[in-house]
Amino acid sequence: MTATWSVNKKIFLQNAITVKNNQPLMAVVKNNAYHYDLEFAVTQFIHAGIDTFSTTSLREAIQIRQLAPDATIFLMNAVYEFDLVREHQIHMTLPSLTYYYNHKNDLAGIHVHLEFENLLHRSGFKDLNEIKEVLKDHHHNQNAKMIISGLWTHFGYADEFDVSDYNVERSQWMEIVEALLSEGYQFDLIHAQNSASFYREGQILLPHHTHARVGIALYGSRPYSSLNQHDIVQSLTLKAHVIQVREVQAGDYCGYSFAFEVTKNNTKLAVVDIGYGDGILRTRAKHEALINGKRYPIRALMMSHMFVEVDGNVHAQDEVILYNNDIRIDEYTFKGVGANSEQLSAMNHDSLKKEYISNDC
């Protein structure tokens, strides 16, 4: 038996349609589409009516171009392979004044999106004056030059409700957008909203915006806990099997380095064929697994195995669910296991069997 990572294609597609809510989305497909597989995700998103994509990798951007010849593809990281960016008609961020002045000749013919730094401080122009400096210099540049097609930022605090930072970054951003538009500047694409912001705004675009740039919600995880589970549906299942059930006694230690001390006689431990080598985070192993519709506590994690404390209703060959729509990735995000994307990224697709299921089972 081999632990299996599987995605229900119909549920994945329907979730994307529901998330889109008839709004223009830029689907974030970075890191191999959150490890759902880039080709699979792009194909499904196209079926859902999405024709604009973003990633952080030039290699992935080129792959998307091969999959979607007519799509708009936005590269969120600045790169230096300018000929490749031009050749594949990829849009790219313009991250700073320094980058602009160092490479404005290299950028000739490339579509760029001016990036506002905002509270995240990861990349971008620091204020309106820096953005206008580029716009003015670009206007007076008589040489072959870049094409300013977009304006964007990233909200780093849209999933935080106990602080005012989202309102601050949203307000600062809207002031930038409205100031530029009021001075007659025009942009084909204006985008800022991530999944959390998109849902906080009622699944509609902010004023003047052309797209919401949505990632994790498209993959079936809620960006914050107060959202109803029915609003975003997980299509992913991660399952393993019980190899055998062992009976242990009070005082026994099970697992490496005294991982679990047994406190009751005749305790039953299911040995399950999945472990941290398959991508189960140690923080996830502090919680439960689902067997025959019931949750049981995980007691120890090893490279290729785990111990789950069970009862007499669990037997060899029973399925053990680590994730599905009843025991969701986002549930464990909110319990502190790790970000949705962190749990997805940890899974080892070289050791897990991968399946894409075409029906509702």
From Swiss-Prot:
Enzyme class label: isomerase
Function: Catalyzes the interconversion of L-alanine and D-alanine. May also act on other amino acids.
HAMAP family attached to this UniProt entry: Ala_racemase
Family (UniProt): Belongs to the alanine racemase family.
Reaction catalysed by this enzyme: L-alanine = D-alanine
InterPro entries linked: Ala_racemase (IPR000821), Ala_racemase/Decarboxylase_C (IPR009006), Ala_racemase_C (IPR011079), Ala_racemase_N (IPR001608), PLP-binding_barrel (IPR029066)
EC code(s) of this entry: 5.1.1.1
Protein name, entry field: Alanine racemase 2
One Gene Ontology molecular-function label: alanine racemase activity
Catalytic residues (UniProt): K30, Y256
Pfam families with a match to the protein in the record: Ala_racemase_C, Ala_racemase_N
